[in-house]
From Swiss-Prot:
Species in which this protein is naturally found: Homo sapiens
Catalytic activity: [E2 ubiquitin-conjugating enzyme]-S-ubiquitinyl-L-cysteine + [acceptor protein]-L-lysine = [E2 ubiquitin-conjugating enzyme]-L-cysteine + [acceptor protein]-N(6)-ubiquitinyl-L-lysine
Gene: RNF217
Transmembrane segments: 503-523
Record Pfam families: IBR, IBR_1
Protein name: E3 ubiquitin-protein ligase RNF217
């Protein structure tokens, strides 16, 4: 390291020459401003010898024959001759942690005050008339250094400025183009030049932010801090680009703005995204419950929960509002509905298998064995023809006869109802847990009666399945123990309606025609009579 000379002027007194060492290569000590433009209160070097009768220090004087050993101004190993000379009135302590800076300052002040009282006694410095004594203050910088500002006589109207730079370390920020780079702010007159350290992340300076810090100036002066902060962070939409669900809309689109609307299901005001099909308001909780119930029923094409809307919800909207387990079931039902008759899932693990027919003519012994399938995933052996576990030595027709046991169990009455009821269309057994007799098959959407197993039918003027005298009525609603009489009564009512209805219609038409003909003759006569009566009344009055 090279050495350089620094001269400190102390209010017109003799100049003192000190030797200093540059602290960091490539960052020399900035020169102090000279002349009238940089006038500052007279400062004295901490190591200046006392002149006259006093020691010339604000810390009190002890024995002048035994001067106080100078504190180390730098890291261990620095000598007094190698220590950098500081401006008069400023003492530089060792590097401190910025996070624990206030605590370290308080501890250091207490130690120094205790040492001063011990060595110098209770001597105090008095200020001459017309001047005030500046209290001893400290200003911390972000680079870990502390500036001790010693008390000094100065006019009360003097203004002191301390310029420091704070650098914020950036991480993972893209470099700005040359046209958008900001130039560093110009230093005010009388201030030392600001040396920016080399940056490894970004080559452009951060925008300038000047903040008033009057709390750092206890003497009424102003301390200006120039902060070089990082540029503003990038917004998430600009980094992410176009949203991945921008085409969904409605509840399935997380980028649609929320609006406080009343849910059509629970009738509560909530932040709701309108449905994409009918733009109606359904809250997320109600929609998730509805979709989960539909998936549990095996529905693939799920209708809109709004009764006025007859459209089906989009697949993306359904998947977005389902849980992980329900989403797996829904995707399985989708695949099951898209396949043809040559592809079936495994009864155990739901792995899809495609059956390829061979060109040879099957023999009676091999006609059934060709449908034997072994699942490559779970090694389960099953029959592709009847979609059941493999039945060795038994054909599919005989194996299906085993369903008689199931039908017998389903027809048994327990707790006042059947154990199960078979759908009249797809022939699957359905067990009711609660509710009325009107059932809807989850496989084929057929409406049937759980009590009798017949479809729900209705015809205007002839009644529906709940009518006692209708031919479409349930057999358990009218004379369940006398089926022949029930059929006779219902048949007679139906025949009577068939024959009486036309007669009533013809009679009604005839009466209507007669009324029209009579009206054509009676209405003009009535009008003439009424007019003649008015004339007769007016003649009698005159």
């Amino acid at each position: 390291m090279g050495e350089e000379q620094s001269t400190v002027s102390g209010g017109g007194g003799p100049q003192e020459s000190q030797t200093l060492a540059s602290g960091t290569a490539g960052h020399p000590e900035p020169p102090r401003p000279q002349g009238d433009s940089a006038r500052a209160p007279p400062l004295r070097a901490a190591s200046a010898e006392p002149s006259g009768g006093g020691c010339g220090s604000d810390w009190g004087c002890a024995d002048t024959s035994a001067p106080e050993p100078a504190r180390s101004l730098g890291p261990p190993g620095w000598s007094k001759s190698r220590a950098p000379a500081q401006p008069a009135g400023l003492a530089l302590t060792g590097p401190l942690n910025p996070q624990t800076l206030p605590l370290q300052l308080e501890l250091e002040e207490e130690e120094e005050e205790a040492g001063d009282r011990k060595e110098g006694g209770d001597e105090q410095q008095e200020a001459p008339p017309g001047e005030e004594l500046e209290p001893r203050t400290r200003v911390g910088a972000a680079d870990g250094l502390v500036l001790d500002v010693l008390g000094q006589r100065r006019p009360s109207l003097a203004k002191r400025q301390v310029f420091c730079s704070v650098y914020c370390v950036e991480s993972d920020l893209p470099e700005a183009p040359a046209s958008e780079q900001l130039s560093p702010p110009a230093s005010p007159p009388g201030a030392p030049p600001v040396l920016n350290p080399p940056s490894t992340r970004s080559s452009f300076p951060s925008p300038r932010l000047s903040l008033p810090t009057d709390s750092l100036s206890p003497d009424g002066g102003s301390i200006e801090l120039e902060f070089y902060l990082a540029p503003e962070p990038f917004s998430m939409p600009s980094l992410l680009g176009a949203p991945p669900y921008s085409g969904l809309g409605g509840v399935g689109d997380p980028y649609v703005p929320l609006m406080v609307l009343m849910c059509r299901v629970c009738l509560e005001d909530k932040p709701i995204k309108p449905l994409p099909c009918c733009k109606k308001a359904v809250c997320e909780e109600c929609l998730k419950v509805y979709l989960s119930a539909q998936v549990q029923l095996g529905q693939v094409e799920i209708k809109c929960p709004i009764t006025e809307c007859f459209e089906f919800l989009e697949e993306t909207t359904v998947v977005y509002n389902l849980t992980h387990e329900d989403s797996i079931k829904y995707k399985y039902f989708l695949e099951l509905g898209r396949i043809d008759s040559s592809t079936k899932p495994c009864p155990q693990c739901k792995h899809f298998t495609t059956f390829k027919k061979k060109g040879h003519i099957p023999t009676p012994s091999r006609s059934e064995s060709k449908y034997k399938i072994q699942c490559p995933t779970c090694q389960f052996v099953w029959c592709f023809k009847c979609h059941s576990p493999w039945h060795e030595g038994v054909n599919c027709k005989e194996y299906k006869k085993g369903d008689k046991l199931l039908r017998h169990w389903a027809s048994e009455i327990e707790h006042g109802q059947r154990n199960a009821q078979k759908c009249p269309k797809c022939k699957i057994h359905i067990q009711r847990t609660e509710g009325c007799d009107h059932m809807t098959c989850s496989q084929c959407n057929t409406n049937f009666c759980y009590r009798c197993g017949e479809r729900y039918r209705q015809l205007r003027f002839f009644g529906d399945h709940t009518s006692n005298l209708s031919i479409f009525g349930c057999k358990y609603r009218y004379l369940p123990e006398r089926p022949h009489l029930r059929r006779l009564v219902r048949g007679s009512v139906c025949a009577g309606k068939l024959f009486i209805a036309p007669l009533i219609m013809v009679l009604g038409l005839a009466l209507g025609a007669i009324a029209v003909v009579i009206g054509l003759f009676v209405f003009p006569i009535y009008c003439l009579c009424k007019k003649q009566r008015k004339r007769s009344r007016t003649g009698m009055h005159w």
